[in-house]
Each structure stands twice: as C-alpha cells, then as structure tokens.
From Swiss-Prot:
Full protein name: Anthranilate phosphoribosyltransferase
Gene that this sequence comes from: trpD
Residues that bind 5-phospho-alpha-D-ribose 1-diphosphate: 88, 91-92, 96, 98-101, 116-124, 128
Keywords: Amino-acid biosynthesis, Aromatic amino acid biosynthesis, Glycosyltransferase, Magnesium, Metal-binding, Transferase, Tryptophan biosynthesis
Gene Ontology BP, a term: L-tryptophan biosynthetic process
GO molecular function, one term: anthranilate phosphoribosyltransferase activity
Positions with a binding annotation for Mg(2+) 1: 100, 233
Length: 347
C-alpha cells in the first residue's frame, strides 16, 4: 500500500479508535515491505500502545508477519503428532537461566516435536539464540535442514531474523522509542512452523488472557499462556497465572510448584549470567547434574509442554516425565546431536 492509501487507516488510529484485523494487517504489510516512513511508524506504534492494542489488532499484525515470513518446509503429512513452541516474550526484567530453551531439549527428548522460535536477548544477558551459539548450533541453519532436524531429532530452532527479514525496518524506530510496543508480543505469535500447540510466557499478568485470545483467533489448537510471579514462564518461586486454550475454550487458573509435585525455590536461585555461564548451567541440567532449583524450573516448563502435546495427562505427570528424561541423559544426548548436525552442515 502507498503512503496515501494507508492514511485513512492512520487517521482512524490517531482518533483513538480501533482498527479491524484486516486494516491492521494492511498497515503492518506496508511496514514489513519497507514502505512506511519512520516518523509515521513511530506514530502508529505509539497510537496503538497508548490506547492499548486490541485482540483484532494483534492478530492482524501477526497475520501480516506470518504471511511475509520465509516459508518453513514441513508438510502436513509429517504433522501427525503436532508441533509445539515453548517461548516467552522476554522483557520481564529478570536475568534468569535459559529455562524455556533448556526445557525445549527436555520436551523433545521426551517425545514432543519442538520448533522453538527465538531471538537474541530482550531482558536477560543471554537469550535463546545467545545460548545456542555457545553450543555451536548455527542460528542461520537453512529451513530445509531445520525441518530435517525436527523430523529426525524432534527439535529445531528457528532464528526470528532469518525468517522475518521485514522486521528490520522497525529496528531503528523501536530503539529510538525505548519503550515496549506491539512488537514485544508479536515474536512468539509468528513462528514460521505454525505450531499447533504453544506454551507462551508473557512479561505482564495483564497480557495472559488477551494473548490466549489472540492464539485462539490465529487458530492455535492448544495453548497455555503463562505469567509466573514476574517471569515470562512457569514459576518455581511463586504462583503462575494461566490461560489455557483447549477445545476452543479458554479457562483461567493458577498453578503453584506443589501442583507440579516439586518444592518452591527462591528467585535468587534461578539467576543466570553471561551466555558462557548459562551454557554451562544448561549443560549441567541436561546431564542430570544441575541444582534442584534449576532442574525443577526446567522440568515444570517442559512438563506443561508435554501436557499440551498430549504426552501426559496432567502437568504433574508431565513434570515427572521431564525429570525422568533428564535423569536418562536423553536430553543431553539430543543437545550433542543437534550441535553435530549443525557443525557438519557448516563444513
């Protein structure tokens, strides 16, 4: 769309009114194609933020970004079990160990098909991609190789900038604004593998139910959207607020560590460090040599993923399966296999 054709949509926004899903998709398509002036983009993002983005607007922005993404070749014939993503928005302000990335290895080793969509760090010192780079896992692995890893190893990591080139047009504006915008919630919603199942952590309790409604609008089959006492994942240090999408309905409830069959820990026990230090922690956990707090934090998140995939009938049973998988050494073996495939592809 040209600058003149998006003007009526911007006028609606600047009057404090909401856009439809289709109208928002049109605006974001223009942005992704690099056809939106930066001043206009800043105005659009701030108008959305100040009024508060609606379910339809977040869904429309996600539609545009999904449509423009580099395709992920995973035919429906290979989707019999369904794919899950274990992902957080980031930006919760805490520097924890890489819980969701480590949980992805555990869930995959326990039988889930995990396509984890990730990026470099938002709030911690070490994001999902920073950690994987430490293990020699190539972030720019071709979509074809990533698809083969998902098929043969149950796990692949999809580096967001590799699939969503158009987002680069928003980077200078986002950096200049220095405040959260709709982009902070879009990352987890635009996985190019289009997972049927999602364990999605959000940085604010106010986002839990709205983001579950967005997943419902986007056609996700089953999901848990969680906020864990300040963290964008299931909490070991307190209660977790959950909106679960199942059979087209959303139910809201709270979980505590006792619901998973593990003891509560202190937040300080989950603090992470630089990527090299976090890589050491992840390796220890996957080898069955992590601290109780680290191991349990990973297991309760992997346990929710296993529950969502239908591999366990409760989050408690899922956590037990995750803990047994860690003890078996299968998750550590998977880390080594993925690193090996990645390094061979780079030779």
């Amino acid at each position: 769309m040209s600058a003149t054709s998006i003007q009526p949509l911007l006028d609606i926004l600047f009057q404090g009114k909401a856009l439809t899903r289709e109208q928002t998709a049109s605006l974001f398509s223009t942005l992704i194609q690099g056809e939106m002036n930066e001043a206009v983009m800043a105005g659009m993002l701030m108008a959305l933020k100040i009024r508060g983005e609606t379910i339809a607007e977040i869904s429309g922005a996600a539609d545009a970004m999904r449509a423009a993404a580099k395709p992920f070749p995973y035919p429906s014939s290979m989707r019999t079990e369904g794919i899950i993503d274990i992902v957080g928005t980031g930006g919760d302000g805490f520097n924890t160990i890489n819980i969701s990335t480590t949980a992805a290895f555990v869930a995959a080793a326990a039988g889930a098909k995990v396509a984890k969509h990730g990026n470099r760090s938002v709030s911690s010192k070490s994001g999902s991609s920073d950690l994987l780079a430490q293990f020699g896992i190539d972030l720019t692995m071709s979509p074809e190789l990533a698809s083969r890893c998902l098929e043969s190893l149950n796990l692949c990591f999809l580096f967001a900038p590799h699939y969503h080139g158009g987002v680069k047009h928003a980077v200078p504006v986002r950096q200049a604004l220095k405040t959260r915008t709709i982009f902070n919630v879009l990352g987890p919603l635009i996985n190019p593998a289009r997972p049927e199942f999602m364990l999605l952590g959000v940085y604010s309790p106010e986002l839990v139910t709205p983001i579950a409604r967005v997943l419902q609008a986007l056609g996700t089959q089953r999901a848990m959207v969680v906020h864990g006492s300040g963290l964008d994942e299931v909490a070991l240090h307190g209660s977790t607020q959950v909106a679960e999408l199942k059979d087209g309905e959303i139910i809201e409830y709270q979980l505590t560590p006792a619901d998973f069959g593990v003891p509560q820990a202190q937040m300080s026990e989950l603090e992470g460090g630089e990527p090299a230090q976090n890589a050491q922690i992840t390796q220890s956990i996957l080898q069955g040599q992590g601290s109780d707090a680290h191991t349990h934090a990973v297991a309760i998140n992997a346990g929710c993923a296993l529950y969502l995939c239908g591999l366990s009938d409760s989050v408690k049973a899922g956590t037990a399966l995750a803990l047994n998988t860690i003890k078996s050494g299968k998750a550590f073996e998977l880390l080594n296999q993925l690193a090996k495939v990645s390094s061979e592809a780079q030779e």
